[in-house]
Amino acid sequence: MGKFEQKERERISTFSFPTTGSQSSTSIKSLGSPLYGRFSSLSSTESQFDSSKQPHEYEKSFYFEESQGEALFNKLKTYSFPGDKDGVKTRRNSSICPRKPNAVSPLRVESNELSSHSHSRSLSHELTKPSGRRKSYHRKSHAISFSRSCKPNFIDGYDSNSSIGVNSRKTSLASSFLDKEYHSSPDTSYTHQMSPKNTIMNTNEQLRRNASGRFGSLKEFAEKNQINIEGKIFAHKVETGDILQPLIDLDIDNK
């Protein structure tokens, strides 16, 4: 072991935290223990409860010491020994668990004071601002332009180069569209018109199905449609083993 490495190990092993208030210093060993932080074990003097202190004073000093310990730990983790492996250095230099300031820590108290002060300033600024129409942040939509393929027929009757104003043009287009919808026949507008040829073909097909849909028995139906009904039971077909009128014996217990 080199002289420099031995000196560093002795310095780290004898290091201790500075005392804060009436509480004693904590050994560096508590840093490596899983109970380091807010769950670290207290000494005999720290475990004694002072009745003169309020609970929030204990909590405030507790979180203040914790934030100091975290700051010191972040400073110490930058140190490394020459014999350390790369994995140890990486874990030591990595951020373990970055946390936000606690609810009653001095950092949180100062941030709350600053935020409340800025909020009061912004509120006073809003009150002194002259009243008017609120600025809209909605995204503007573009007007829809009809293409050649989807342009309605009634638009063709108007000349785009005419001297009619934009508003009057819109009104005339809308009224023309409404008049056309009102005077148009509901049959031609909302029903699907089939050609006579398709109607005749569908009628002939339906007649053919009705003519060939009557069979003397289930066996004849199965033979014409090439269906195997052996060992199968069909509803309301006695020849297949179905019971047309099943009976329920209510006096089964009396027998």
UniProtKB/Swiss-Prot annotation:
Record keywords, A-Z: Phosphoprotein
Composition bias, Polar residues: 13-30
The organism's place on the tree of life at top rank: Eukaryota
Region described as Disordered: spans on this chain: 1-32, 82-142
Basic and acidic residues biased stretches: 1-12
Bias (Basic residues): 131-142
Keyword Phosphoprotein: yes
Knockout-associated phenotype: Increases sensitivity to copper.
Phosphoserine sites (modified residues): S217
Keyword Transmembrane: no
Protein name according to UniProt: Increased copper sensitivity protein 2
Name of the gene encoding the protein in the UniProt record: ICS2
